[in-house]
Amino acid sequence: MEQVNELKEKGNKALSAGNIDDALQCYSEAIKLDPQNHVLYSNRSAAYAKKGDYQKAYEDGCKTVDLKPDWGKGYSRKAAALEFLNRFEEAKRTYEEGLKHEANNLQLKEGLQNMEARLAERKFMNPFNLPNLYQKLENDPRTRTLLSDPTYRELIEQLRNKPSDLGTKIQDPRIMTTLSVLLGVDLGSMDEEEEAATPPPPPPSKKEAKPEPMEEDLPENKKQALKEKEMGNEAYKKKDFDMALKHYDRAKELDPTNMTYITNQAAVHFEKGDYNKCRELCEKAIEVGRENREDYRQIAKAYARIGNSYFKEERYKDAIHFYNKSLAEHRTPDVLKKCQQAEKILKEQERLAYINPDLALEEKNKGNECFQKGDYPQAMKHYTEAIKRNPKDAKLYSNRAACYTKLLEFQLALKDCEECIQLEPTFIKGYTRKAAALEAMKDYTKAMDVYQKALELDSSCKEAADGYQRCMMAQYNRHDSPEDVKRRAMADPEVQQIMSDPAMRLILEQMQKDPQALSEHLKNPVIAQKIQKLMDVGLIAIR
């Protein structure tokens, strides 16, 4: 049994430090030695959830409940995994089942409230944004025939992209039928169902269930401690921090087993800007919480406050460490967002610290040597390193674009040329290399435009003048097959995006069947721009 406890503690430390695989290994070894220990399955469930393996987290949560049906945390683990698996109804039932055994468990109560809110949100989600929308409509006889009507498809796409228009379209019987199919309910009988559900009003029952009389069961010292805490909270709201500290200190003396009073003191010191004291108290609170088996959400809050204190001091690495500890105990959107923010700032700081123009020049020279030898992949690596060392040097992007062109990676070459031009709009090479990439892609119209811009900057640029002439001749002598035109057009990311847009495909179908519809669509500047793009690349022609 001693070995089991050692493995469990080792697993707990690994999980707190973010070493999830080590934690899983420790818990699994402990389970082999003591397969009836419900706490081990609970801890491993938390580790699997942290890793993102929610199915295994759910299985361990179920095992925890099987071994210890009267233990609230087992239900919390199981329900949390179900939440991550988007099985909200089952998660709600699990929280409710847990509350039958531990009616005053704060963690289960909060979980149930969260699930009820999530399920309520689902009623207001956009049903027209389902990934299998058209498949669902095709499979139902009520909507199958409607799909042959282009105006119906256009209406569906409108609601898919702008669900706020639903209120103005709800009177359309086709939309009512569609909603019935998508939501899987008969909307005609909804009013009756709602009326039937109204008689037992939820608010009064919630008030009756609120455990206010529970304070009568508390020992006198804990009652007094709660009163002191309330007085401390009032003082805190008024920013009378010294008075708040006195009340929290008194509450802590009356009930030394409750970590909340210590974290409240930490909050006061945080507001006063004494971050060292704040962290010291949070560590103490966590220690008290662990000793008294406090709800892990409270432990998570203490870790998050330590993270916030480091964030305030711009010590982002330390902040991330404690945010991760908080998330290991309990994941909340606020802490996750703060952690991601700290990671983003730290990454940017590291990027800026990496900048060194002297080392960039060394890498550039190495790249030039490799380029002259024809070793383009190696040259590209040196130019990439040079860009990391000096990301504001336009010439580095131009050099790497030349490598990409040699390696036939024309889209990447174009991207680097755009960056080069943005950094130094008067640098001729940026334009000539961009035009060369477009010319290689046989997009002669665009290539001529770019060569023309280069000539506007320097009318004596022979490279631009020769390139312009080549493109003119190639365009004149061009006899592409429709397949070549389509293949070349579909290599353009902008064309790919237009052609994958269901609304645009519907418009193009309408144009084929009814050419008069074009004039109506061209009134929309966004659609007109997309149609012009398709005309430029030769995919469509208007006679």
From Swiss-Prot:
Alphabetically ordered keywords of this record: Acetylation, Cytoplasm, Isopeptide bond, Nucleus, Phosphoprotein, Repeat, TPR repeat, Ubl conjugation
Disulfide bonds: none
TPR repeats (start-end): 4-37, 39-71, 73-105, 225-258, 260-292, 300-333, 360-393, 395-427, 428-461
Modified sites of kind Phosphoserine: 16, 481
Residues with N-acetylmethionine modification: 1
Pfam annotation, one family: TPR_1
Keyword Transmembrane: no
Modified residues (N6-acetyllysine): 8, 301, 312, 325, 344, 446
Chain positions found as Phosphothreonine: 198, 332
Residue numbers covered by motif Bipartite nuclear localization signal: 222-239
Record location of the Glycyl lysine isopeptide (Lys-Gly) (interchain with G-Cter in SUMO1) cross-link: 123, 210
STI1 domain segment(s): 130-169, 492-531
Domain comment, as recorded: The TPR 1 repeat interacts with the C-terminal of HSC70. The TPR 4, 5 and 6 repeats (also called TPR2A domain) and TPR 7, 8 and 9 repeats (also called TPR2B domain) interact with HSP90.
Protein name listed in UniProt: Stress-induced-phosphoprotein 1
Gene that specifies this protein: STIP1
